[in-house]
From Swiss-Prot:
InterPro entries: AH/BAR_dom_sf, BAR_dom, Endophilin_B2_SH3, Endophilin_SH3RF, SH3-like_dom_sf, SH3_domain. Belongs to the endophilin family. It holds the Pfam family BAR. It comes from Mus musculus. This is Endophilin-B2. Its main location: cytoplasm. Residues 340-400 form the SH3 domain. Keywords: Acetylation, Coiled coil, Cytoplasm, Phosphoprotein, SH3 domain. Residues 24-287 form the BAR domain. The keyword Cytoplasm applies. The lineage of its organism: Eukaryota, Metazoa, Chordata, Craniata, Vertebrata. Residues 205-234 form a coiled coil. Residues 1-27 are annotated as: Membrane-binding amphipathic helix. Homodimer, and heterodimer with SH3GLB1.
Length: 400
């Protein structure tokens, strides 16, 4: 008990000394030991790394989970060391609603069939999103969070300890300075004409006491300097480790980009498949359109919007004499466009023809396009002046 009281009193004294030194430094009444420029640069780089890592981490979490309530729930589960429950993605939820709507409205109707196809695509998109979130969390968010909760806490702890060692060192310097000033004043030879013998004896005794105080202050200063240098070296090594942290975060960033690229490639592939499915059945749903299918036309459901679509083209009259699909690419000059089956299209991007059967395109130019029976729905016949050739639908904006 006595030992604990002595330790408590000693700790309280050290804390008070540091508080006094810190306050005097803030008011400019005490000298402060400055760190070298390289050390200050290391501190600044570490602080910048920590701040930007926090921002990137928070914004990536928002990207992966835009719902703030869901993010708070996941945070609480992690703090409680409990497994985060599986959550249905927005795409999967939309797929569920579309499937239920198709079941209620009639899965055999054109609208119901399309709802089923789109719901299956949305379900695949939701599964791809789930995989992307899982991969990005493991390969990118977890390393960033480990740095903030592990390495940075260690660095912060050692920096606080270095700050305390510096305050102790500066307090020892101030104490030594005061002791030397008092010693110099005490060793001043008194004037025997004005000083009584008794005061002279007291002055000599005080000089001896201040000599002991100076020796004690010098010893404390040496100890404080040694501890400060040791702690500065430990902190310096940790701060220099930030370079390794940057290398690790760079690798994690590459992994994040790779997972994001895979995710968007999967989404593109799923949507392209869906577009082909919808395009192959569009001619059967909307009469007066042709996309390369020979299915019989159904009664019209509604008038089409004047906005452009990539797969809707006027039907070619059956009376037109055209070359077989195998020979269409070789005899394009012999193919006459139908009188009522052409449309205008604006070119979205430059396109370089791969062979003589294709037509090179320039962005923003207007061309005439139409479809031929049996053609790939991703291609149309384009005409510009006397030139004619196949053009990809994705490079065009069909005008009403």
């Amino acid at each position: 008990m006595d030992f604990n009281m002595k330790k408590l009193a000693s700790d309280a004294g050290i804390f008070f000394t540091r508080a006094v030194q810190f306050t005097e430094e803030k008011f400019g009444q005490a000298e402060k030991t400055e760190l070298d420029a390289h050390f200050e640069n290391l501190l600044a780089r570490a602080d910048s790394t920590k701040n930007w890592t926090e921002r990137i981490l928070r914004q990536t979490e928002v990207l992966l989970q835009p719902n703030p309530s869901a993010r708070v729930e996941e945070f609480l589960y992690e703090k409680l060391d409990r497994k985060v429950p599986s959550r249905v993605t927005n795409g999967e939820l939309l797929a569920q609603y579309m499937a239920e709507a198709a079941s209620e409205l009639g899965p055999s109707t054109p609208y119901g069939k399309t709802l089923i196809k789109v719901s299956e695509a949305e379900k695949r998109l939701g599964a791809a999103e789930r995989d992307f979130i899982h991969t990005a969390s493991l390969s990118f968010l977890t390393p960033l969070r480990n740095f903030l909760e592990g390495d940075w806490k260690t660095i912060s702890k050692e920096r606080r300890l270095l700050q305390n060692r510096r305050l102790d060192l500066d307090a020892c310097k101030a104490r030594l300075k005061k002791a030397k000033a008092a010693e110099a004043k005490a060793t001043t030879v008194p004037d025997f004409q004005e000083t009584r013998p008794r005061n002279y004896i007291l002055s000599a005794s005080a000089s001896a006491l201040w000599n002991d105080e100076v020796d004690k202050a010098e010893q404390e200063l040496r100890v404080a300097q040694t501890e400060f240098d040791r702690q500065a070296e430990v902190t310096r090594l940790l701060l220099e480790g930030i370079s390794s942290t940057h290398v690790n975060h760079l690798r994690c960033l590459h992994e994040f980009v790779k997972s994001q690229t895979t995710y968007y490639a999967q989404c593109y592939r799923h949507m392209l498949d869906l577009q082909k499915q919808l395009g192959s059945s569009q001619g059967a749903i909307f009469p007066g359109t042709f996309v390369g299918t020979t299915e019989p036309a159904s009664p019209p459901l509604s008038s089409t919007s004047p906005t452009t679509t990539a797969a809707t083209m006027p039907v070619v009259p059956t009376g037109a004499v055209l070359a077989p699909p195998e020979e269409a690419a070789l005899c394009l000059e012999e193919v006459a466009p139908p009188a009522s089956g052409t449309r205008k299209a604006r070119v979205l991007y430059d396109y370089e023809a791969a062979d003589s059967s294709e037509l090179a395109l320039l962005a923003d130019e207007l061309i005439t396009v139409y479809s031929l029976p049996g053609m790939d729905p991703d291609w149309l016949i384009g005409e510009r002046g006397n030139k004619k050739g196949k053009v990809p639908v994705t490079y065009l904006e069909l005008l009403s």
